Amino acid sequence: MRILVVEDEQDLNRILAKTLTAEGYSVDTCFDGVEALDYLEGAEYDAIVLDVMMPRMDGFSLLAQMRESGNETPVIFLTAKDSVPDR
């Protein structure tokens, strides 16, 4: 199973990749939505772990562009937001 991790915080990006790799997944990593679009043009993924708040393009905008282009890859969102207004 091939997973794309899209997370701008370098330590969390590295930890996610290391953990998923240790579980036997093939993992690619990138740091924002714009970079993720480049990865998605060149490869197919079974799942995407996607941060909500990122520079250049946030996770919601990336997901919207993916769906508009017909990409139905399952997405797992990550966020540090925890208050009701943030939801």
Report residues per predicted region.
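N-terminal/domain-start alpha-helical segments
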Residues: M1-R87
